[in-house]
């Protein structure tokens, strides 16, 4: 059975697993259905990222047609987001999909507000 690793994210988009939404506030009050969906900002864990922003490859235009060096038409400027980061993003820009029974969101990098990344060296020092 295919998993998330089989999904290919294109362009400047990221695939996010949203955090679980609670129907209860921190004070114990239960919220009516739909209240959480009206919030402007949501958080989640980044599962996959696209290759980045496409830019023209000058070597493709300037090179000789028979040359075998770097013949890709475009290059990609990589994204800041990395798999495993926690992200806060604009909910209105998210596209919700369901893949194998799991709710996922596809979001452009420009809609990410904050990234939280754990320092891998910090874990080694503990």
Question: Which role does the model predict for each range below?
Answer:
Residues 2-126:
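Compact, glycine-rich, soluble single-domain proteins
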